[in-house]
Amino acid sequence: MAGHLVKYGKHRTRRSYSRIKEVLDLPNLIEIQTNSYNWFLDEGLRDMFDDIMPIEDFQGNLSLEFVDYQLLEPKYSVDEAREHDANYSAPLHVTLRLTNHETGEIKSQDVFFGDFPLMTAQGTFIINGAERVIVSQLVRSPGVYFNEDTDKNGRTVYGATVIPNRGAWLEFETDAKNVSYVRIDRTRKIPMTELVRALGFGSDDEILDILGDNESLMQTLEKDIHKNTDDSRVEESLKDIYERLRPGEPKTADSSRSLLTARFFDPKRYDMAPVGRYKTNKKLSLKTRLLGLTLAETLADPDTGEIIAAKGTVVDKDVMKSLAPFLDQDDFKMVTFQPSDEAVVTEPLKLQIIKVQSPDDPEQEVPVIGNGNIDIKLKHIRPADIIASMNYFFDLQLGIGNTDDIDHLGNRRIRSVGELLQNQFRIGLSRMERVVRERMSIQDAATVTPQQLINIRPVVASIKEFFGSSQLSQFMDQTNPLGELTHKRRLSALGPGGLTRDRAGYEVRDVHYTHYGRMCPIETPEGPNIGLINSLSSYARVNKYGFIETPYRRVSWDTHKVTDKIDYLTADEEDNYVVAQANTPLNDDGSFNTDTIMARAQSENIETSADRIDYMDVSPKQVVAVATACIPFLENDDSNRALMGANMQRQAVPLLNPHAPLIGTGIEYKAAHDSGVALISQHDGTVEYVDAREIRVRREDGALDTYKLMKFRRSNGGKNYNQRPIVKVGDHVDNDEVLADGPSMENGELALGQNPLVAFMTWQGYNFEDAIGINERLVRDDVYTSIHIEEYESEARDTKLGPEEMTREIPNVGEDALKNLDEDGIIRVGAEVQDGDILVGKVTPKGVTELSAEERLLHAIFGEKAREVRDTSLKVPHGGGGIIQDVKIFTRENGDELSPGVNMMVRVYIAQKRKIQVGDKMSGRHGNKGTVSVVIPEEDMPYMPDGTPIDIMLSPMGVPSRMNIGQVLELHLGMAARKLGVHMATPVFDGAQDTDIADAVKEAGMAADAKTVLYDGRTGEPFDKRVAVGVMHYLKLAHMVDDKMHARSIGPYSLVTQQPLGGKAQFGGQRFGEMEVWALEAYGAAYTLQEILTYKSDDVVGRVKTYEAIVKGDPIPKPGVPESFRVLVKELQSLGLDMKVLNGDKEEIELRDMDDEDDDVVNVDALSKYAQQQEEQRKAAAQTDESKTAPATKNESQPNTQD
């Protein structure tokens, strides 16, 4: 027997075919959300207050400082917030200190800063009662970037961009004459030397002294001439720059200095963020720039004089190892330049300069200038950064240094929840800061308190806006646990500060070599977002700078053996190493088993020897995301189909009694455990009590833990979320163990579908184009039955004419329609309802009309009751029938928070039990999707020699052209697993080989080709050829025919065009388009076409008359003029074309004649008058014979919706 047994949780053992020893467990799969939010609460919030505070008034008399903050207990628990449509949030209190510098008085006060949304343990937020996820964003990292391009003459031109987190961009470029320019914030070009002069180095000699002489710099100096000799060079440059940035304004050196200081050197306006400083230091540091260059000077230890590297030495990794400690010192090869007093920044400029030989001409010395190891805490740009960037830019033209790839994951970073929230909070705080400053100058300094200065509205509004309407705050995908998990691990390049769909080219969307182990190369949506929305790989994590790291096993550099020491590397760091694949064969002592090893060096796949290997992958599945890692035999599937398989697993509907896959990949337990839908124990202990609603566990220290189970809760997508206990009384449970299965789980494992018996065969053409034939048993035995819960809401409000009332007494409704309502007119739990049934009886007062004498008498006798009311009951919409699962009533008397003007709210939940039926979409895990085309009686299905009928028939044509052979391997191994009675695990890229499958097939006593003879259930004859039959994990997807099928009888019309609305949600009509019209024209079906263009569309009067004729049984009248035709006529008249309609005798027909109307256009008032007459006639008829007209009234009240 190949394979070995592995336990997944306490309730499942699988035979695993993996060969590679796992040295690292998978991390917690939602830590990207939880870690980031916890960082925000612990550090991010405090950093932000420290940034904004202290706030001082314009005179500097008052200052408001931040002392501390605390989050109090949340108002609602998670479940209460869900029920009350509220936020799960905690009040934020901030302690502020107000200092009056004139009197020395200090006032401290606790100020309420609004309710702050809290993250649940599952990594989600509850906003207005709905679970939401904040998706992490992939953005370009702040830093210095260099790029190359080819101009129209075929010359290579270089460019550089300094990108801050917020603030002005700085760009360097050269023109066709090799003159270098700088642009500030995408404005007009400024010669680069002008910026250097503005920094305080006015003369040409000073500039050459700092930057060294090179061709482009000389050309620039020639162009940058001294025009106005009255001004010094520094002042002239400052004025020039000001003129380019603010054309038309009077230019002075002072205003230019303050403008440049505000643009670049004010930490409040220019922020590189720690990551920007880290990237800039890394890029401009001599440690990275000297590698591979030849020294043009001898470097010695400044203290001892000992030579570190002689002139002419090539700086390789070993030389750099001895050189690096010196380069980190503050005085090694540092040169200080003193700017003039007129400069923007007058502090001395410290640069680290080392001369190297030019690659083209060894005689030429080229300075390599570092930015002088600027402190990592410094957030804004320094003159040293600008000079060092210019030097890098000039060196590139000589072939020194390298350009950056913007799609490299070393240059793209993740903004997770914490940082996104911090940025949003900062916006709110800076708006508040303005208000505080204004109030400081207005209010009396002696009596003012912090509370009077603070207005928290902007802060609260910005947080509300972020959670409510940001592109990155999304309604959680709650179709099944895998969908939830994937949504929390999603990375989006879209959103504020990111890309837009239309501007994103192929390069951004493409798979990059740095995605390896960081972002899944397979899981991404099909369609316009392909490649812009990705998924985090299974082992990846995000470091403090927001870069994605992936773990590798360290290879000892002296023994060349693979150790169990794990290092997490970013994409930048990985570029320096050679990494071996996870499936490289090893000996027991960790040494490599083969002489040549397949490895990766940057973007190349190479074969190399053991002594060159630095690291080794930790696991074969570190390349892919969780959903992709759930696909067995992924290595045998084409990537396009694997993409569909990964995406469709997220759409699998939770079934009534799901089964974990017979052929899994071993990640099912971890995915279900971390998804947040399973019930997990918090402590070790023994189970004392179990029922469907709660589990009680006695801890070892004697305390009792009670766990409440989630029962039939409606998820975000209208699916049924339910938990079932899997422990028994007396069981010992460990901390972090699964106590109860959630939806789509079985025995603690992910169970998205079922394991039916599948045959690859045709059946009378019913398999054409991916259609699926299924056995009636799947319908009858509820194998693919799912429960769907829909929520409906009705509110009783105060109106101008009086309050609405929930009641059983509804006008013109028979007792039959009220049989399931209680005395308040609310439906009872457990009632079965159909489309159009009343769920909540509600009446709204009508406008008071002039009463007749008889009505006044009735009013006097019976009082209020004779008042006219309108029926505004909540009814079951089309296709919404089912069983009432729950009713929730909220009233002001019970202390429920309701929105203003609402006195009572009722929520009704209807559960539908949906069996699989023709038209439903199903799929396997390999992208093999199809729709059910026929349900075949069990006795007619093909059956196996032992009499077992097949469950599902798939078309064999779906395999060869799509190259997803994994489904066939799963089929064969699944059959063996079924016969052997075991569950199997075949991890991705490390699963069962063909020999393993052959052995399992043999062990199960199947034929060597794993096929079998099938017999026709109708005739009993065997089919000609042997058929591949086996077990495949097959899912029912959320695209169900019940949600899509739709037909319109009478419904609403668009106010503008007077044509029927579209779509199922609006109860709209089907579009009869251009091609469909051609089809009717081809058959000469003139009257059908006329009806479609008139009564069924926008002939306003005609359709009302037609409806009347149908109700009364009269012949249908002639159609009138469609509204769109009138529009056409008016359009042509507006163009000055006189258009007339003529009859057969060439006589003009007035459009009004065709409608027998007085007016050109049908008046809406006329329609409502007509409807009113209808209503009065109907009432008269109802009084004479109520029973006859009861069904008609229900329909007749509907045409009024067209207004």
UniProtKB/Swiss-Prot annotation:
CDD domains: RNA_pol_B_RPB2. The keyword Transmembrane does not apply. It catalyses: RNA(n) + a ribonucleoside 5'-triphosphate = RNA(n+1) + diphosphate. One of its GO terms (molecular function) is DNA binding. One of its GO terms (biological process) is DNA-templated transcription. Keywords: DNA-directed RNA polymerase, Nucleotidyltransferase, Transcription, Transferase. PROSITE patterns: RNA_POL_BETA. Residues 1190-1203 have a biased composition (Polar residues). SUPFAM superfamilies: beta and beta-prime subunits of DNA dependent RNA-polymerase (SSF64484). Residues 1167-1203 are annotated as: Disordered. The keyword Transcription applies. The RNAP catalytic core consists of 2 alpha, 1 beta, 1 beta' and 1 omega subunit. When a sigma factor is associated with the core the holoenzyme is formed, which can initiate transcription. HAMAP family: RNApol_bact_RpoB. Belongs to the RNA polymerase beta chain family. DNA-dependent RNA polymerase catalyzes the transcription of DNA into RNA using the four ribonucleoside triphosphates as substrates. This is DNA-directed RNA polymerase subunit beta. The gene is rpoB.
